[in-house]
């Protein structure tokens, strides 16, 4: 395949890059991440009891929340991204789940209303989490760290400022301590992510626009050509993911 054919394929991926909820199935067999050293879902299930009232902040399309199989009458969720708000309104509300549009900075829920608040890769505000939790309530979060995908971003887009420069476990833990929480568990890791074709990386970069600012095939052509060379030399395009886990108790 010559380079012009590659470019046409990359532009095709660019055109179709969209997402419902948080569904990466389009590139499922075209990239791979190392497994995290913890199981976020299992950690939640270890704490969860049917009588608990739970809230999922930044629920995406609600897919993960529904996988917990928690009683719907004790389940609440919130989301700010308009396409996902529409999706959740269609899927969660008819089930009896208390879904409300809103951001993690100011959850639209009453004081001391929840036994457990969960948040995977979403926004949060430690004092607000404290406000909506019952005494003894738990906050469990898995977060994307400040250094996530930085090698890939620099490969395609050059030097850019990280979008969330304070996203480190140490900084986040201190914010929760300052808000009055006790830290029960705190873990952080840096793991490998690999892409097996450049088109998959194009789709990925278009989806995660906040990490890859102003990315397009045309504006980042030199970076994409370098990515293609790296792929041909190494069999993959490699970067790092940055994640951390925090469990805090009110």
Predicted segments with their positions:
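A short acidic, Gly/Pro-enriched loop at the edge of an enzyme's catalytic core
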Residues: 105-116
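N-terminal, positively charged/glycine-rich alpha-helical extensions of SAM-dependent methyltransferases
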Residues: 1-25, 34
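Acceptor-substrate binding/catalytic loop of class I
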Residues: 157-171, 212-214
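Conserved Class I S-adenosyl-L-methionine
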Residues: 182-250
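Class I SAM-dependent methyltransferase SAM/SAH-binding core
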Residues: 53-107
